[in-house]
């Protein structure tokens, strides 16, 4: 059997309990088809990048699945029919993550940014003096000369 990570977004006007019931309903489809459902994470009500079916927010849920392709296809078919599911994506993975996903970790625990305090913030952007590049004023620049004998490109 193959390993999958499945994320779906439920409508903003359903409650968290209804989202958990949807998750259980789709998990039962996988189990009936001979698959197993591993970790399930409810990520909460989050803003969408753009409106999806007239919704600006959605309940995000991650489900780790170990099931044959037919079971995943049936679950996706049922999600497509459901009015409560806005979007979903299923990705095949080599192995499931055992630790909480990045969405469940607190911002400080992720460690994806370096120390942002102190230091020489603009040290790498030192412009120095202008050197021999000329004046900094636009009006002081030398303008190209036009040949007075030209007729503006017309023959």
UniProtKB/Swiss-Prot annotation:
Gene for this chain: rpsF
NCBIfam families per the UniProt record, alphabetical: S6
Name of this chain's protein: Small ribosomal subunit protein bS6
PANTHER family to which the protein is assigned, alphabetical: MITOCHONDRIAL 28S RIBOSOMAL PROTEIN S6, SMALL RIBOSOMAL SUBUNIT PROTEIN BS6M
Job description of the protein: Binds together with bS18 to 16S ribosomal RNA.
Keyword DNA repair in annotation: no
Region (Disordered) residue spans: 94-155
GO terms of biological process kind: translation
Keyword Ribosomal protein: yes
Record key words, sorted: Ribonucleoprotein, Ribosomal protein, RNA-binding, rRNA-binding
InterPro entries from the UniProt entry: Ribosomal_bS6, Ribosomal_bS6_sf, Ribosomal_S6_plastid/chlpt, Transl_elong_EF1B/ribsomal_bS6
GO cellular component assignments: cytosolic small ribosomal subunit
């Amino acid at each position: 059997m193959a390993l999958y990570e499945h994320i779906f977004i439920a409508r903003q006007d359903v409650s968290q309990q209804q989202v958990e019931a949807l998750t259980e309903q789709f998990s039962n489809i996988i189990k009936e088809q001979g698959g197993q459902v591993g970790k399930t994470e409810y990520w909460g009500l989050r803003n969408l990048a753009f409106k999806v079916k007239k919704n600006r927010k959605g309940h995000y849920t991650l489900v780790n699945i170990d099931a044959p392709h037919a079971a995943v296809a049936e679950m996706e078919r049922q999600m497509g029919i459901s009015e409560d599911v806005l979007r979903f994506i299923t990705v095949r993975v080599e192995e499931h993550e055992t630790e909480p996903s990045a969405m469940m970790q607190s911002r400080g625990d992720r460690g994806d940014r370096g120390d942002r305090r102190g230091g020489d913030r603009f040290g790498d952007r030192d412009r120095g003096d202008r050197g021999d590049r000329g004046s900094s004023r636009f009006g002081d620049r030398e303008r190209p000369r036009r040949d007075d004998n030209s007729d503006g490109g017309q023959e």
